[in-house]
Amino acid sequence: MTHAWSKQPIPYAVEVPDRAPKERYYSQEFFDLEAEQLWSRTWQMACRLEEIPEPGDFSVYEILDQSVIVIRGEDGEIRAMHNTCRHRGVKLATAPGNCAKEFVCPFHGWRYDQSGRNTKIPMRKSFAQHNLDADDVSLAPVQCDTWGGCVWINLDPEAPPLRESIEPAASILDAWKVEDLRVEWWYACRLPVNWKLAQQAFQEMYHVVVTHPQLVIAGMRYGAQHGEFDPKRFVDAEIQYLHTMSEGMAGMVHATDVAVAESIRDIDLPADPAAAMAAWYLVLNTAVVEHHRSLGHEVPDLVDLEAKGLAEPMGYVFPHYFVLPMYSSASSYRFRPVGPEVTIMEIWSMTRYPSDAERPRPVPPEIWPHDDPRWPPIPAQDFSNLPRQQLGLHSKAFEFMRLSQTGEGHLSNFERVLDGFLAGLPHDRLASALREVNVNPLERHVVDIEF
């Protein structure tokens, strides 16, 4: 259904697709508009299902000044509700836990069951009847759904269903069986930068050569273009890349998969570059799949994914969530604004286990500063750039970001979809634009965004 709407003015709007005004990344006015029109209307990853495995388990999701309880009920159903007592507004939960049967307000003892229904009001007769309506004194529900091993919430009760809001990323990542991934570790960082700057560092490949030079496979593919291809050197370079990614991310490419690659290092490959590369990936993908299936792991058919062009996806779900699967495992990122120039970034390293394996319940991590020496090398390199960028944007000589039409196309597309939300466009006018950004950001050019 098409709704009547009146476009609202946007401060510092993107008027030229490849130029983003600098004020978008530090203006309080712009930040407040995002809180009102973006974060109140979009689907957000609230927690992993692993965080609430048992009846009564709950997690607390915070976005700006809004707090949401996500709970698995005794009936197995997952619900979300605003984390505020209906009496005088006290937060009911400040950390994840298990509520057994009910939530109790620590101030005056109002009680709520796992569905949010009010079960007790002390001195009930002292309240006027108009303050005791059953719906009014129950916790306000929040729209929620599950996908990809996570619970998602949307503060807008009129928002369209989750699945249609996160395509085509959902279908692509379903092929990778991301719902079967389980957490190995979960880290969090407090970055002194705007949330958009923080995540845009992971939405383009343009920076890799300078920021992450260790990731550049230096001779092999270049040599192949000049008639210097050597299958042995190619395999050595590929395995070195896997080691570098695995060690640099403390995951993503799992050490188990690197070991599988090492076990086939000495295979014979054709002299023709294209044939050798195809043969290597076929053997490697087959070996990884066979290894994990022998252990009882639910792992996708990597050979089939390669044939379908899905072998190296980077799933992005607007506005704040990434999944980066590689071979058996993956990393995922979530970004949440704290202030115009402060962001919490979280990283999960995930891999596969037998379906009946017992895993510890993930708990929210300590939030590390961006320059903490415990960060793995690759995110540490990104974190070193970001505070300098945030400071540089305040220069009186700098007006706007100049974006590459190809290498940074997703940044432009993202910013213009954001403007659609900030203009107050209804969900049905935003649907097609969302499909342009719920994709692998590394492969996007600047595209026409139509509302």
Language-model features, listed with the residues they occupy:
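General detector of N-terminal leader/presequence modules that precede the first folded domain
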Residues: 1-10, 373
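Short, contiguous pre-domain boundary segments
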Residues: 7-22, 179
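Glycine/alanine-rich phosphate-binding loops at beta-alpha junctions
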Residues: 13, 23-64
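Generic structural signal for secondary-structure transition and capping sites
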Residues: 39-43, 90, 207
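Short Pro/Gly-enriched beta-strand edge/turn motifs at strand-loop
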Residues: 41-51, 123-127, 314-318
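Rieske [2Fe-2S] iron-sulfur-binding domain
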Residues: 51-157, 161-175
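C-terminal catalytic domain of Rieske-type non-heme iron oxygenases
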Residues: 72, 77, 143-146, 150-451
